[in-house]
Amino acid sequence: MKVILPLISFILLLTCGSPSKPILKISTGIKNNKVVWGDTLQLKLKDKIENKNIQFYLNERPIKKNHVFTNEPLGTQRIKAIITNDYGKRSTEISLTLLAKAPPKLFTYNILNSFPHKITSYTQGLEFDGDLLYESTGLNGQSTLKTLDFKTGEVINNKPLDESYFGEGLTILNDKIIQLTWKSMKGFVYEKATLAIQKSFPYKSSKEGWGLCNDGKVLYKSDGSNRIWILDPTTYKELRSIEVMTHKAPLHNINELEWVDGKIYANTYQFNKEVSVIIDPSSGTVEGVIDFSGLKELVEQHSQLNVLNGIAYHKTRKTFFVTGKNWSKLFEVTIEPKE
């Protein structure tokens, strides 16, 4: 006991007398942690560490203390500082939000034609292949993949999904149809000519299936958040994602997608209005908002009538076709600047 007590006292003395590690805090010189392209960081480290070397990183890429934001993809920006001195390394990290530089432009529509659309179709995906219209519909027990004569609404081919699946967006690439399901963490690949299922694929990072389109090389998938995921065209694995942002905030609830002339046109549940947005896929910038107000009032009004959802571009006619969940009409429109 005589030996143990002095030893314990010595250990306690060392512990109590040991200096604590200095608190590290990054100063950015940015108000509200929100930036746009053209803004300059003024990075400093608030600490009391002596004889140190500091390296700053933006999304794991080394940057200078006075970094200027230029064309980075929008959304969350992670800034890390790694401090090195004779005693080793320490690090600290903060996040900023990179917003769009300018507000989106406003657009409206001009109706050219209206065509019959099955009032029982809970539309989730819409895309043309030549003059043939492909449609994916939702709801458990009612979900289908079908081809249509867009002028008459006649169903040419119909492939029901198992009642356990809730159908979502679709797109056509390399003579294959790719269709999403909502919460089953699974998509399906079909032979375009026959609608025969070839295989399925899992979701990994993206937890739900909403909208789908392609640029001829890769697929773009929405999951109900403000992210659009880029998928490998062969394995359908998520390669990376972009964050969809306005000049004020992230834009969530991105739904049905269509690729047109290098931009993504997307239906969305934002704003409590019948709107679509135009997205720059390289940055995530919302470049335009299309106000489709008034279209819903032109279809048959009934108890199951639901929101605008379904946008397809006809490459030959150079017009858009839009409809909604349980809408009785399919509208052919042009999109024009709003005055």
Where do the protein language model's features map onto the residues?
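C-terminal motif of bacterial Sec signal peptides marking the signal peptidase cleavage site
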Residues: 14-15
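A short helix->beta-strand "capping" segment at the edge of beta-propeller domains
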Residues: 99-119, 150-156
